[in-house]
Every structure is written in C-alpha cells, then in structure tokens.
Amino acid sequence: MKKIIGVSLLIFCAGCVSVQIPKYLQDKHPYKKEFYAGYEETLAATKRVLKDSGWAVSSTTDPSVYEETPQSRNSLGKNILILSENKQTRMLFFSRYTQLNIYVRALKNSTEVEIRYEAVTPIPFKQFRSYRNDSFVNKFFNQIGDLVGNR
C-alpha cells in the first residue's frame, strides 16, 4: 500500500510542472547574419522557413516596443520582430518547450536577421534553460540564404 501511495505521489508531482516562457526573449545569446538581399525578400524567406520548419508565428511587432538598440537606430526604418508560438517536443519522461524571436532589419545594402532562441526543459522542482542551438540556427540561416540566393 505504501508503494502505491509513493508511486501515485511521484506521478502527481511529475504532472504538476508548469512552464513560463515570455513572448519576448532577452539577448542572452543572439545569432546574427547579414544577407545581401532586399528587406521584403528576406522577410518573406524568413517567414517561409519558419512555416516549413513547423513553427507558428504568434505575432509581429516593431522591435522598439521592447528595446531600443543601435542596430534599430541604424536600420532604414524597416525592421520587424517576429514572435513564435511555443513549440513542445515530447521526451520520454518530460517535454521541452522552445521559442524563437526573429528580428529582420533593413541595412544600407543588405538585411540583417537576428535569431534569439530559448529552450526550457522542466522537471519537478527545477527548470533547465538553454539559449543556444547552433545546428538549428545554422540550418535556419542556410535555408534563408538558399531562398534569397546568397549564403
């Protein structure tokens, strides 16, 4: 009987993990890449790669709503922040929740794309956060480069 109660409590605790991920991600480890293509073309390619990768766009906004940076002041007035929906990846005993913020900024002869990534892996009484995923971001940038015609 004690084993059944102990196992029941363990299962109950494992099911009570909640995750809070804000829509806006701070620049803990941003990835940036410059594409020698027009702003509209790069923005369309970025949205297409997001959709093809299984990400849903939560909303788009002006980045100055959240922060004012030298990059946004240097842009030619064309910049956008794309906020993704949380993406859940199921593991054996837990799930991982990831989110992206993507900035697209028009520069003089190019367009800069900045990706902020956050993954949260909750377990009972602890949450592990990661701000890096080099292979995912490099693949994402390569797909944008393929669509706009440069790397």
Description of each model-found segment:
Residues 4-13:
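Sec-dependent N-terminal signal peptides
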